[in-house]
């Protein structure tokens, strides 16, 4: 099964990308993400997915728990996360099956994907920095994996000669 997932920058992009065939909209929310170009208000979040790819310090666990509660109230589709504390607290709110592990550059093998799937999350997003051959091998071994096929990716973390 193929799903087209789009990270939007502007709310005005939602309807046009849905009309073009997107199955899922991802939004960056203020205080939930460190990398989204545009950070929306939590009030804009309804029945979409959220990019929650920041790290939480020990003194921010109450903030994290409240953010997860807010997302549950808004019927979030998926939560893209990289900090394991998100998984830990999502269990208490029955949100684990909404989680997508997206640590940008760390998911590089079928074992990485299997580790998180065994914990009940929806799926993992493969690193966009691995080769096409590596990606194909993982896709042959594991079902329901997210692969970035277009867009701006974090190239500064790669040690490969990309340019």
Would you name each region that the model predicts?
Residues 118:
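Residues lining hydrophobic/aromatic ligand-binding pockets adjacent to catalytic sites
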